[in-house]
């Protein structure tokens, strides 16, 4: 089990968000799956309101809209006794809206977004197709270990698979 310190923050006005212990367990599952558990790890997960997420996305990615998760990896210039992964900012209203639009349970989508963001902090990306395939497969495997179905399986695909 990963030695994990989580700084869990809720922005003012956020009343609907996963419990800290759940977020901790999702990050730990990601670290354990990747065997990133040989050193203590610290990260921050902030649940943000729409305006804050939009401002950060605009400032750091030049995209003037709120997105589901932003990752800010920390790259230390020196060896530290603990791995400081960085910060995740997850937009509560975007995650809740996406879950509804995609007909997923909100908690399953929250789990996916925390795992997805943690993978970004660990250096995974999805810009190129092969990177996306690798990252998505890791997400599927971690989610499956938590009893959550494939988040990339769309409702249309599910209908096709039952015919």
From Swiss-Prot:
Its cofactor is Zn(2+). One of its GO terms (cellular component) is cytoplasm. Keywords: Cytoplasm, Endonuclease, Hydrolase, Metal-binding, Nuclease, Ribosome biogenesis, rRNA processing, Zinc. The keyword Cytoplasm applies. InterPro entries: MetalPrtase_cat_dom_sf_prd (IPR023091), YbeY (IPR002036), YbeY_CS (IPR020549). Its EC number is 3.1.-.-. GO terms for biological process: rRNA processing. SUPFAM superfamilies: Metalloproteases ('zincins'), catalytic domain (SSF55486). It is found in: Cytoplasm. Binds 1 zinc ion. Belongs to the endoribonuclease YbeY family. Single strand-specific metallo-endoribonuclease involved in late-stage 70S ribosome quality control and in maturation of the 3' terminus of the 16S rRNA. This is Endoribonuclease YbeY. It comes from Idiomarina loihiensis (strain ATCC BAA-735 / DSM 15497 / L2-TR).
